[in-house]
Structures are given as C-alpha cells and as structure tokens.
A protein has these predicted regions:
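Active-site microenvironment of metallo-dependent hydrolases
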Residues: 10-116
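Interfacial and helix-entry/exit segments of alpha-helical transmembrane bundles
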Residues: 1-12
Length: 116
C-alpha cells in the first residue's frame, strides 16, 4: 500500500522527531516547540506546475539548490542560500589540512580503502 503525501510528510516531520527522541520539542510548528524550519523555493521550472505544494516538496525539490533559508530553534542559519553561522571556506581549508596530515602520517599508504 502506497503512502499518501500527508503520511509521508508526517513521517518526515513528527515521525523523525519522535524517532530521535525529540518528539516533545520539535517536529511540528506549534507554540512551545523549537522552530526548526526549512524555506524552499518552488519557483524553478522543475517544480512546475505547482498544483499541490506538498507534492512539489516531496517529488520535485532538489535537496540543496532549492533550499532558500533555514531556521534552527528559531535562529536563522541559512539565508538566501548562504550559510551564516560558519565560515565554509575555513572549514574546507581546515579539512584539507587535516587530510594532508593524515596522508603524511600514513607514510605513503592509503588512509581510506574503497572496495571495488
């Protein structure tokens, strides 16, 4: 039996919150709960026509390019598709430096094995 759009959204919101033990603080837009909100841009041609915004969210939205803004516990962390809370360039630079150290410590060996 297929899930309805409403059931699928409920699983992704209230259900996800419940499974992570946060069902009493998040998972729904209600007074007293954390305001964890993702604002999605449905204006792209891949989202058109929008007969049902819920269906567009589930079937058409691209995971990163359509996310416009994000609030976590009411705090704006992404605005106009830009991360506000961390310096992404610095994070990537730090990660590259750590990876280089790991390669150096491996004495020329592999630091990660990928099965064929």
């Amino acid at each position: 039996m297929a899930l309805t759009i409403s059931e699928t959204l409920r699983i992704g919101t209230r259900g996800g919150a419940t499974l992570t033990g946060l069902g009493d603080v998040t998972g729904a837009l209600e007074v007293g709960r954390r305001a964890d909100i993702v604002l999605v841009d449905l204006s792209g041609v891949h989202c058109r026509p929008v007969h049902d915004p819920r269906a567009a969210l589930l079937y058409s939205v691209r995971s990163t390019s359509d996310v416009h803004s994000v609030l976590v516990d009411g705090d704006l962390v992404v605005a106009d598709r830009r991360l506000l809370t961390y310096d992404l360039a610095q994070i990537l630079s730090d990660a590259d430096a750590i990876a280089a150290e790991l390669v150096d410590l491996s004495r020329g060996g592999t630091i990660q094995h990928y099965a064929p």
